[in-house]
Amino acid sequence: MSAWVLAPALLVVSCSFPDEKDDTDPIETGSIQLQFDNIVGDQDLQLDSAKYMNAVGEDFTVNKLNYYISNIKLVRMDGSVFTVPQDSSYFLIREANPESQKLTIRNVLTGDYTGIEFVVGVDSLRSVMEPSEPGRKGILDKDMGPTNEEAMYWDWNPGYIFLKLEGSSDSATTANGRYYYHIGGFGGRTERTLNNLKTIKLTFPGQKAIVTTSIVSKVLIQADIQKVFNGPAQLSIKQSSSLMFSDSSKYVADNYAGMFSVKEIKIN
């Protein structure tokens, strides 16, 4: 009888273990904000109303400005890179929509950051995905939402329009006096074509962006539309009033690759 009494007690003792201690440090993350501010030279960009002048002396207004920002990477003080997960790394900046110019990047590893990299455009991987796949939904959905509303996708030449700049100019040779720059081209689906994807690398000037669980840094990035006309190549509206999927579009892409700069960083 005593053997039957002792058995449960022995079983309880044999199954009792001290709590195991996990010495692994938890991964801490925070957020960083990116604010895109579109300007023309030293002036704030104003749609429709303000008139500007390019480097060759042609007046112009801006009626529409949209561009994709994707594949964001943040450079830490030690040179290592934090890559924003791709599914969270596609944005359509629209001058007509101020909220679209404010990007909040979450789940960023805590630390001090001294630079940023991003792509202007939508990479080939996303561009060749089937439209029904999850990776082509949200901001990249060509059939609904901002991409559809702003007509930022070519159905006739499948691919996204990386940058769309439209406006009026006395120098435009179109019948309605407008200019149209729709720049895209991811390199081709089955054969090599135009590749106007541009990787932008910016260093934070004399400042660092601090990311902690409680501190959020705001990085103000300016995009100077004047650089679209005046960069490695000087663009004349009279000579090129409409540029889309053509060899000449690469000159516009080369120009706008230089339009970004970091103005300041604010720590909240």
Task: Report each predicted region and the residues it spans.
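Bacterial N-terminal signal peptides that target proteins for export
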Residues: M1-V5
